[in-house]
């Protein structure tokens, strides 16, 4: 299957090459020429690993031995065989995506990406090492480091915004072991780090480097495709619980930053899964809510630091893929992305906005409401959730109030509450004194919810990666590795 850039349909590569390169040469994102035919009902009959194998084989057919790759990625690494279990909380179904090795939803994709990338490297006869460049707003960095550490033929460099991640998230990254890993803080915010990574790709295009650059961010289709599985898993769980009949549509509320997680839901729908409305939940950085409401994407606003840092983003890269999927017009997408880069704003045509709003609905949740939601859900329903999940919960409530759409609702829970203990303790009336590690212990004592072992084991570990650089120094830093 051929993939081409969202900005130019002429230069096509096969799916293995798209995974290997990560970003298209013109700065666009790789997308398949067509969405393949898919037996979605057969996909629902298997295990989570069976589902992943079927979906990835359909979307990335040029990568062989997919079943073995899936088994290597997931077996024994998650808390349950389902990988992403669901739990009924009040009137919603919560899809718990934090049961992997780093307690964040990105484990699903970043356990799989190293298998896809190293196989794609072999398929393409590449002898050079691959250098993975990743910008993180918190969770991607650790999940990528966990997936790629000590993988032969691959090096990884993670950039994170200095002071822009939680103490626990920072500790997860800077204590990372492995002979092929580098972690560095960037003075600036996540958008600065992400833009810096894209500029490194552009600056190195066509140059003879001792390594090939690739990405572990969701700009890489190999990062995005594995996330489709858990939408099928959630639907299957609803079937098994008797909450729906086969063919019934289900709504999904998705905490959204870079637009990758929610786009995976749309890809699931394109593969045939009966997905109803996809609810895009933002925090106070509500550029996506404004866009879905008005059709104007305007990043010309201050980036606010919130209690949900993985959504502290003003440039949602994967939205470009949606614009392409719904318009099919690479020239339009290229023009819009140029406007965003030069002017900081663009407006989509009315018919494209109508197509977006037919599939997506947007709402946002500031820190105050996230705190209220976490406290209320715990007090009334006994469920402990993090600030990102609270945004998804609040958006789901908003959607039902505004639309009176009472189809079954799945709220994606994207991170363990123990990654954000001060916010969660504040919400449920706990003492927030001491370090985040003290807070985790106090939170567990209050609620009886165990601390994930990967987080409780961080305290006292040695900081191995303490560098801090200016955003303009990122290229020089990478070339020096």
What are these regions (language model features)?
Residues 1-481:
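PLP-dependent amino-acid enzyme catalytic core
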């Amino acid at each position: 299957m051929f993939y081409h850039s969202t900005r130019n349909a002429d230069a096509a590569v096969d799916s293995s090459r798209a995974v290997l390169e990560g970003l298209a040469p013109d700065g666009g994102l790789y997308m398949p020429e067509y969405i393949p035919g898919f037996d979605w009902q057969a996909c629902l009959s298997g295990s989570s690993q069976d589902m992943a194998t079927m979906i990835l084989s359909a979307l990335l057919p040029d990568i062989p031995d997919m079943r073995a790759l899936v088994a290597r990625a997931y077996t024994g690494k998650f808390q349950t065989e389902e990988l992403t279990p669901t739990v009924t909380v009040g009137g919603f179904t919560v899809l718990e995506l934090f049961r992997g090795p780093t307690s964040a939803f990105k484990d699903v994709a970043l356990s799989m990406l190293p298998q896809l990338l190293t196989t794609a490297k072999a398929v393409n006869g590449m002898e050079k090492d691959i250098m993975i460049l990743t910008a993180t707003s918190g969770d991607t960095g650790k999940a990528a480091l966990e997936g790629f550490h000590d993988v032969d033929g691959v090096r990884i460099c993670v950039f994170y915004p200095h002071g822009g991640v939680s103490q626990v998230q920072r500790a997860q990254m800077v204590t990372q072991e492995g002979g092929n890993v580098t972690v560095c803080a960037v003075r600036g915010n996540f958008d600065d780090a992400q833009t810096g990574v894209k500029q490194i790709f552009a600056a190195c295009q066509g140059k003879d480097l001792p390594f090939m650059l690739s990405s572990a961010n969701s700009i890489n289709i190999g990062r995005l495709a594995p996330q489709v599985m858990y939408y099928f898993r959630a639907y299957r769980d609803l079937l098994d619980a008797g909450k729906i009949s086969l063919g019934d549509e289900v709504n999904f509320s998705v905490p959204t930053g870079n637009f990758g997680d929610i786009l995976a839901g749309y890809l699931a729908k394109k593969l045939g899964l009966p997905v109803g409305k996809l609810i895009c939940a933002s925090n106070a950085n509500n550029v996506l809510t404004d866009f879905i409401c008005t059709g104007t994407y305007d990043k010309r606003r201050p980036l606010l630091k919130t209690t949900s840092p993985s959504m502290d983003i003003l440039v949602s890269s994967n939205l470009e893929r949606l614009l392409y999927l719904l318009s099919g017009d690479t020239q339009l997408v290229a023009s819009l992305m140029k406007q965003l880069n030069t002017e900081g704003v663009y407006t989509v045509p009315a018919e494209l906005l109508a197509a977006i709003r037919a599939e997506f609905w947007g709402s946002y949740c500031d820190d105050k409401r996230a705190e209220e939601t976490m406290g209320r859900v715990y007090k009334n329903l006994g469920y402990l959730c993090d600030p990102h999940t609270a945004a998804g919960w609040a958006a789901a409530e908003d959607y039902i109030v505004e639309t009176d759409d009472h189809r079954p609702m799945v709220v994606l829970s994207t991170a363990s509450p123990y990654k954000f203990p001060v916010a969660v303790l504040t919400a449920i009336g706990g003492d927030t004194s001491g370090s985040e590690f003290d807070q985790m212990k106090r939170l567990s004592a209050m609620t009886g919810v165990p601390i994930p072992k990967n987080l409780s084991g961080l305290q006292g570990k040695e900081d191995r990666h303490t560098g801090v650089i200016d955003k303009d120094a990122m290229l020089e830093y990478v070339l020096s590795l």
